[in-house]
From Swiss-Prot:
It holds the Pfam family LNS2_PITM1-3. PROSITE patterns: DDHD. It comes from Homo sapiens. This is Membrane-associated phosphatidylinositol transfer protein 2. Keywords: Calcium, Lipid-binding, Membrane, Metal-binding, Methylation, Phosphoprotein.
Amino acid sequence: MIIKEYRIPLPMTVEEYRIAQLYMIQKKSRNETYGEGSGVEILENRPYTDGPGGSGQYTHKVYHVGMHIPSWFRSILPKAALRVVEESWNAYPYTRTRFTCPFVEKFSIDIETFYKTDAGENPDVFNLSPVEKNQLTIDFIDIVKDPVPHNEYKTEEDPKLFQSTKTQRGPLSENWIEEYKKQVFPIMCAYKLCKVEFRYWGMQSKIERFIHDTGLRRVMVRAHRQAWCWQDEWYGLSMENIRELEKEAQLMLSRKMAQFNEDGEEATELVKHEAVSDQTSGEPPEPSSSNGEPLVGRGLKKQWSTSSKSSRSSKRGASPSRHSISEWRMQSIARDSDESSDDEFFDAHEDLSDTEEMFPKDITKWSSNDLMDKIESPEPEDTQDGLYRQGAPEFRVASSVEQLNIIEDEVSQPLAAPPSKIHVLLLVLHGGTILDTGAGDPSSKKGDANTIANVFDTVMRVHYPSALGRLAIRLVPCPPVCSDAFALVSNLSPYSHDEGCLSSSQDHIPLAALPLLATSSPQYQEAVATVIQRANLAYGDFIKSQEGMTFNGQVCLIGDCVGGILAFDALCYSNQPVSESQSSSRRGSVVSMQDNDLLSPGILMNAAHCCGGGGGGGGGGGSSGGGGSSGGSSLESSRHLSRSNVDIPRSNGTEDPKRQLPRKRSDSSTYELDTIQQHQAFLSSLHASVLRTEPCSRHSSSSTMLDGTGALGRFDFEITDLFLFGCPLGLVLALRKTVIPALDVFQLRPACQQVYNLFHPADPSASRLEPLLERRFHALPPFSVPRYQRYPLGDGCSTLLADVLQTHNAAFQEHGAPSSPGTAPASRGFRRASEISIASQVSGMAESYTASSIAQKAPDALSHTPSVRRLSLLALPAPSPTTPGPHPPARKASPGLERAPGLPELDIGEVAAKWWGQKRIDYALYCPDALTAFPTVALPHLFHASYWESTDVVSFLLRQVMRHDNSSILELDGKEVSVFTPSKPREKWQRKRTHVKLRNVTANHRINDALANEDGPQVLTGRFMYGPLDMVTLTGEKVDVHIMTQPPSGEWLYLDTLVTNNSGRVSYTIPESHRLGVGVYPIKMVVRGDHTFADSYITVLPKGTEFVVFSIDGSFAASVSIMGSDPKVRAGAVDVVRHWQDLGYLIIYVTGRPDMQKQRVVAWLAQHNFPHGVVSFCDGLVHDPLRHKANFLKLLISELHLRVHAAYGSTKDVAVYSAISLSPMQIYIVGRPTKKLQQQCQFITDGYAAHLAQLKYSHRARPARNTATRMALRKGSFGLPGQGDFLRSRNHLLRTISAQPSGPSHRHERTQSQADGEQRGQRSMSVAAGCWGRAMTGRLEPGAAAGPK
């Protein structure tokens, strides 16, 4: 739901406005009623006494809007649904109107209006709730300044030119509002609160925005201009005169609409019945209250709402079968919306119910007749100048955090620019759908970018709070390359001669042919050059802006259906290679194969028919990097060149030998060129007339923007990821493969680290890419993107290519050897993993959804339709390998799968060498099954609209671009998480030596996880150090203590300011006035001098709480690691911990490591998705860490009165657990059994998977007894929303980790939720190693917002 408050000042009194409004409504009703498809019927007009606003007039109208909505949307609606029913309650100066539509039950427009004698300064006319205020956008409409579409502009309706002959008012200046307020002239304002709701899958945001921008705002601008400029017609009229005009208008409307009624007699009776009516207007004879006092009774009761279902009985429209089919379509996707959460399908907060009491009472009749006025092709208009948003700005996803007052140190540089808060820049290359006509609608492109920006903001506020303000979105409009192809193919349709058979004509359009024709056009090359130029311009504008001036983060591209093709080819054209790190997905690639002929056959065709000159004719005959072989030489002159090796230079004539492919035989290259010529001849026969009549470089004008290099230009920045939304790129590349059989598609490597091809399986525009890179992938389903409603932080399934190859070993071997004729360099082996290539939703530390809950899902009785099998099994056990499923087969982990032998090393290396990145490329999104029954012509528009508003897409994108530097619980209850802002500004250090000591060192602060009873002391202790080994102590400096008392959405409460002692320690006892009840509360201590901080939690528990203790190194780690490398995780460990947490036990993690490693260890726990719990460390380096563990556990038992239920560890921990009087049945030891300890503990010999099965099925694990504790403890995981730089910045992109094995045979173990069979929770070594091996404490940038911890 989109909620906007329009404020429309007018230079008249409230009473004059009433007359003007009534006159304008009846006049527009006469002028704009044409019959079926466009017109108004008045069905009921009666007074009411106990309704909205007290007493007034109720009116029931029907608007026929079939001519005013887009054809693709009209094709999916039943004919009876092409009408809008209006119910209005008018108690002037308060009115309320509600619009609904038959057969579209999830659609409504509620408009509530107050008319006040001010200029729009009233801050809260409607007394909105906090939830509604958060969603509200205030939009001022100025009848003078706001632009009007050219096709609607009339000189006589221009307030800047109009002057009344009766009143001598006008013309109005651009600052007329200020002038009228100063001179005390009459002025009033219409406050209109408009709520638009269209709760249908995939279309909600686009349709709601469409209604607001075109059906409401544009109509209101025009109507109020007319109300002012028509004052010579209505000035001096009385209410009696208005009533007579309304009667005449109603009779005229009834007669005109009756001509199109199939039942003439019924229509005649309708005319007679309406003619007898005394009240013919939507307004009451006299207002019940005109003194301007607030009117009571705003709630809309049931008896006030008359049913609009009677309109379904109208005999107009198609046959009943057509009605039932269309109605079923809409109900199907509406049902899908009902089964999902509000976050996915509509923007309304869950507190906003569907009850009528929650709808605002809106604008009355102002925009009645113009509700959907001529919106088939809306004119672009800029309405942002007068738009005052209470949310995020235009395309930037940011939080409204006040700038902090920075007091610089004496030695600081006063002119140094602060670092940019933006860490990720998303460039949206918007090209529209393949069915778009003309140049496209700029406002629609801008609206889509706004929609996805709002979805980013919504998702981040709930589950990724520290990402707020760190991500920026910029729009790059793309040329409509498919419009000419669409026009051509439309003319070829067998139904092209019959304009009345629109749906039949468009259903016969071969959609797959459109991108093939578009990319084969000679104009396509210039379109790619235009995209590169516009992207560079957008990036340059961002760098010049204040927020991007010091930007040093990553840049990602998002390409839609058409924009994705242009983005891919622009990346292939780009002659700026990615750095040759071990982790680069382009390492060893054949960059020289990115020649223009591989991108568009039309380019070679153009070059072959051109004379010399022009730098290669915009790329024909030259290389992609410039410096072509002979400028504009024809194809014949280059026949002797072999395109299978690096004979054509890219930029300066030199090329790294590592970038060469094995040289092919000359006969192969000859065959390749012959094939090109054959294709040229075929295309030339289609375009011969064009090529013969036009000069050589028909489109060589683009070379002026390419510096005469003969190439299409390049991006001025590095690009890390390319995201494609429903893009038919696979078809385009398949055509190029067909044209040039010797071409391997993998050779067309885009200049980015990873390609993500997101699509809906039912989208006719989409196609897969993976089978083009490796044929055997056609047998594997695309990776199913988890639903945001179920798994807001991801379901833990691995997207790594190496895991897919290992898991589906048998499937790959069944389908034989790779099909690519070219052999990838075998010397490369398997690329070493890097942070950029592995920090996916799999390795993202924020994916903390419980893995055991996935494993425990029972299969439902599902339909056997392909789309259900593909899309509806997101969390269910997959069917047999022969049945397509959303995730790899055999998701249920089994020991047999874990021990399955891997593919031969050469095979893995060969497939990986051809891959565009190190993760899966094809990703399937959820869509309702009912969409398969929709008309084909409607699907491209519908699916294209769905990507921008999909929370599935946005959460997936966030997981790919995030990295994490600190830890926190991430709740899964859907509540918004409060954003932390330091309560105190930065100050000078208390000691002059401090700023010298802290040079070139990073903070390593930590707060001990605290445990307390409700009635006992609640003490917080922390230590503030700098350097990974605590080399510098923060002595005598201020530290501010903050706590969140109502997590996760509560406010951060400032408690006190402490001063560190000589060892950097602070201790704080929470006072009685702020004593905490049972629960888990985030704690944050911020250093006043530099705003670095530490995070922790205090857990308040009742006495008798039961807990389960785990030794981190003893029970979880499968390898030994002291500092530098990432310990491997024992398979199934996460699921065992999760099992105990689900039973209601408090989780305690103990380790003998020093507290200086807290950030690293907690980050490692989060990296592997462990449930949240209390973590205990030693106080510095101690001689006997086992004694520390025992003493800590004894303290919990003796002083806090907690009870140990079970304990896990290694053989070294047996003595610790025995010291706290645990029985052998409560001690579980991981490792090889020893005779000495056989009677003292239970050994887990068959792994955690078998142990978990025993716990579940032998009833050895009972639920915790203390129900109060179970309600208080959160079931979240360690999540890492991080602080300032949790997003990957450019200097981290190509970093590799030495602990990562270089060969594919070295694979670390994974937990059961990370096992091969389930592929859940596989975690890359590289990111965890980065977290494990370096300090993670963040720094609050000036004005930055850090997520709560």
